[in-house]
Design a protein with these regions (language model features):
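Second-shell loop/turn segments in exported
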Residues: 5-8, 56-59, 100
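A ligand-binding cleft/hinge motif common to bilobed small-molecule-binding domains
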Residues: 27-28, 64-67
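A generic structural signal for alpha->beta connector loops
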Residues: 33, 53-54, 101
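Short beta-strand elements at the ligand-binding edges of bilobed clamshell
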Residues: 51-63
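Hinge/cleft segment of the Venus flytrap/periplasmic-binding protein
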Residues: 68-118
Length: 118
């Protein structure tokens, strides 16, 4: 923070980044409010949201991954669409992109999603 004192926010993109960012900020001489966002709903990350060290955690809806995978496998095996050779561009019942949604956790909604943390 000494090199870039105008930094207003830092984002982390894996489950360990929130801890690393907050540890780095605690050990720096930063004297202004720096917004922190990170990925993955992990217990340590939720505690950092609760303490106010992290502003937002973005979580994936992991249960939806399994649902869509099972649904697509079912469609492959029970669809009227024939999947002959996907490598040569035949029609597929599997979409190119599947949006599974995200959960945004902050101090305002933390206990709504995780009431046992109260």
């Amino acid at each position: 923070m000494e090199t870039h004192p105008d930094v207003a926010g830092i984002s982390g993109f894996n489950s360990n980044s929130a801890i690393g960012i907050t540890n780095g900020l605690r050990s720096s001489s930063a004297d202004h409010d720096i917004k922190v966002t990170a990925m993955d709903i992990e217990p340590d990350n939720l505690e950092l949201v609760e303490s106010g060290d992290v502003d937002v955690i973005i979580g994936q809806k992991r249960a939806v991954f399994t649902y869509y995978a099972a649904s697509m496998l079912y469609d492959i095996n029970h669809s009227s669409i024939t999947v002959n050779n996907l490598a040569k561009g035949a029609a597929s019942v599997i979409p190119d992109t599947v949006y599974t949604g995200l959960i945004t956790v902050n101090r305002e909604n933390l206990y709504t999603y995780f009431p046992d943390m109260k």
